[in-house]
Each structure stands twice: as C-alpha cells, then as structure tokens.
Amino acid sequence: MGDIKKQKKKFSKPSHPWQKDRIEAEKEMLKQYGLRRKYEIWKTDSLLRKFLNRAKTIIAQRTTQSELEKKQMLDRLYSLGLLKHGSRVEDVLNLTIKDLMERRLQTLIVRKQLARTMLQARQFITHECVAVGHKKITAPSYLVSVQEEPQIRLVKPLNVVQQATLEKTEKEVKN
C-alpha cells in the first residue's frame, strides 16, 4: 500500500503578529460571523488568495491552457455564488473575504432564519441537525453552492430546534 499523505496547514498566519488594525478587523469579523478561532478567518483568506493569484496568472498569460483554466475557475465561482454569470476574470480581483464568509453554511442558515444567531447555527451544524440535500454537514465553514442553497434544511427535531421553528412560525402567523 501507499504511504500516508502528510497533512499540511490550510492557512498561513499573518506576517506581523501585532497590527492593531488587523486585530480589530478580525475581532469584528469573529463577532459578525460567529467564528470560534481566528484561523477560520485565515483559512478563508488563504482560499481567497488562491482565487486571486489564479486570476492574476490567467490574466497575464494568453495561452489556450489559460483560457481553459479561466473557464474552469469562473464556472467554480459561479457555482459558489461568488460571481454572477457574465462576469470577467478581472471581477475576481474585486472579491473580498466577506463575500466568501457570506457563502458559509453557518451564515446561510441564519440568513434563511433557520437559527436565531450565528452561534446557534454553528451548534445546529456541529450537532448534525442540518442537512444539505440528503447529506448531513458537520462543518460550519462548508461553502454552499447556488444549487445546494434551496436544499438546506433542519433534520433532527431537537427541543431547541423545535422551539426555534415554533417561534418562527408564530411570528409568521401574527403577521
């Protein structure tokens, strides 16, 4: 059999540890998106940098291979909902970390009002109460594609889940 592949970090730490502006921006993002650790921000930032670097190399090169890579990258970004159809490669350079954070499963559950807070959405996901299609997802950082977005649903009828959904339906009945 083959050797086990060594796991690598999926992020890199900031180059300078004590930048006040960056630390404050990270704290705000932690609160806004209900994140537990700063490395979740750094992972998302690394993914964004990969997209940006690929876009820069594609723009610089004018080969048939770069055209193929351009089409593949744009299709992936369309499917993730980060770009709209008809966008160009140059539009990839305008993406921000907040665009990626808005496509996380945890954020979409709150936006669809299946949970009241980001932390409650995170709890639902880690306790296997959320499914996308027929598959339970246990990672709050799962990037949901546009096709999967309408298929997000709660699975387990926990007391907390029932209470949250009952409150939601009571609000709808009153209005």
Name each region found by the language model.
Residues 1-112, 124, 131, 135-175:
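Ferredoxin-like alpha/beta domains used as RNA- or RNAP-binding modules
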